[in-house]
């Protein structure tokens, strides 16, 4: 027998069903009315915003064009200013080089005099004296510097002005590069449109970047750079005109000073050669005396060794005779003779040691004095070498630099040749 299956769920009343249908129909009408209102407002908003967007884009495009024109005008002014600045730098550089060429004839004697003074600073010990040569060299430096002072001042001013011009040039180049980059960026912005492939949304594009300036600051900066460049170019032109001068010839004065200096060099070299020869003679005699004294010391040492062997023999004999038995241990003539021999040998050894000590003291004194002689000889050789180098260097004052070849042996002042071993040793000492 079949049974009725009833779904266990809530059962609504019929009025509830009618009410739900009415609410759905009413809400649908209300939603359509609201949607119609929104659609009308959206159409109005679209028209207004489209018009505003088109106008804003056109207005900003016009502003970009005007800004590009303004930046381009400043760029052209900077171009002209940079061209004039380059020309002025070249002109001032040429004038500076011309002034330096006028000093060239004085630079060589000055360099030679300073080189001689520097070389003579390598003198050692007692040879570091303030002699007439040093006085003449200092006087030579003073004479040369006096003739260079006025023109050197202009050269220094030209150098400083060139530094200022280059600083201005660097500033103008920086400003010019900035305007070139700005033109490239603004022209790129002007070329963009709605169909450009590289447009996208950015994060906070309306921010004000650090270091932003006002339009007035921008204009003042460019105008300041231009005005400063023009002022520096005017100063450079005046300096070029002031630098156009001549230096009075001082060849006679410089030649007279050169002759006086070289005369002092020759006189000083003759003095040192005389002293050097005397010291070498003393060294030779001292070396001979040292050799003889060393030979005598060797003989004394040999005698000491011989006497010591004799003393050992006597000691051994005496010691051996102390072992004689009983009454045989008597003080006989042999005992007295051996005892006297020991005493005599001890006295002899003491005398030889004393004389050996005196000889060694004398040898030490001779060696120390020889060292002092050789040190002074080395000083003299060094001083002669330095002054001869100075004389050789000063040949550049009378021989053109391109033809100058040192032809003097810096020790003997003869033509270059292979030095003997003795002279090579002397040079090493120097």
UniProtKB/Swiss-Prot annotation:
The primary location reported for this protein is cytoplasm
Keyword Cytoplasm included in the entry's annotation: yes
- Tissue specificity comment: Expressed at high levels in testis, trachea and fetal lung, and at lower levels in ovary, pituitary, adult lung, fetal brain and fetal kidney.
Output the InterPro entries linked to this UniProt entry: Tektin-like (IPR048256), Tektins (IPR000435)
Can you tell me which residues the record assigns to a coiled coil?
80-162, 225-382
Q: Where in the cell?
A: Cytoplasm, Cytoskeleton, Cilium axoneme; Cytoplasm, Cytoskeleton, Flagellum axoneme; Cytoplasm, Cytoskeleton, Microtubule organizing center
Listed A to Z, the keywords are: Cell projection, Cilium, Cilium biogenesis/degradation, Coiled coil, Cytoplasm, Cytoskeleton, Flagellum, Microtubule, Phosphoprotein, Ubl conjugation
Q: Which GO terms describe its cellular component?
A: axonemal A tubule inner sheath; axonemal microtubule; microtubule cytoskeleton; microtubule organizing center; nucleus; sperm flagellum
Q: Which GO terms describe its biological process?
A: cilium assembly; cilium movement involved in cell motility; flagellated sperm motility; inner dynein arm assembly
Describe the processing and modification events after translation.
Answer: Tyrosine phosphorylated.
The UniProt family comment states:
Belongs to the tektin family.
What does this protein do, in the record's words? Microtubule inner protein (MIP) part of the dynein-decorated doublet microtubules (DMTs) in cilia and flagellar axoneme. Plays a key role in the assembly or attachment of the inner dynein arm to microtubules in sperm flagella and tracheal cilia. Forms filamentous polymers in the walls of ciliary and flagellar microtubules.
Q: How does it assemble?
A: Microtubule inner protein component of sperm flagellar doublet microtubules. May interact with CCDC172.
Q: What name does UniProt use for this protein?
A: Tektin-2
Species classification: Eukaryota, Metazoa, Chordata, Craniata, Vertebrata
